[in-house]
Amino acid sequence: FATCVKGKFGWDFVNSEKRITTPLIREGNEFVPASWEDAIHLVATKLREIQAKYGNDSLGFISSSKTTNEENYLMQKLARQVFETNNIDNCSRYCQAPASDGLTRTVGIGADSGTVEDIESAGLVIIVGASPADGHPVLASRIKRAQKTRGQKLIVSDLRKHEMAERSDLFIHPKQGTDFVWLTAVAKYMIDQGWHDEVFMENRISNVADYLAFLEPFTLEYAEKETGLSVET
């Protein structure tokens, strides 16, 4: 019988040895287990000390998209009413805003331009700096199924050799922070070879001439030098 994909593949973190199960307080160079009462008292005391010494706006609070609306509401109440600061943010904006901005500038909307079904039906999937098997088991299950049933090809670029890297047809390990370089070099190479859809680019993409000019420095030789990947790769 079928089970929920998240429940089937995304449960191991619950019993992970890396999971913190009790508050820890730093003593010297070590973290020592403490009670919740002691930990909360220490945090409250230190926050008040910082506030008294440096002012209200020396404090900042970051809430989480993994908590409920009510809990996020309480966090902003804590910041604004208890510590009298408007320095309150959410990890969703901090983490996802750059991606949303980039997508808006490139595809015209700050959201995914495709669907999980599109990825599953593709002939080739490229994963860059991510591990869907850990972070998005539903998507990973679709890729695994497409590999098994349709022979879908998978390329993974990462610093880590995780499960999806083990399953890949090609795993590349570029220097840290150079994914942009090799991806841009691949785009230039494809255009140089005439493998791009000229009609689509002409009708659906703005500033094509500027983009082509931007690609010029990104030769395969330049990418090899910057990323550590061979031209043959």
Located regions from the model:
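Catalytic alpha/large subunits of respiratory electron-transfer oxidoreductases
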Residues: 1-233
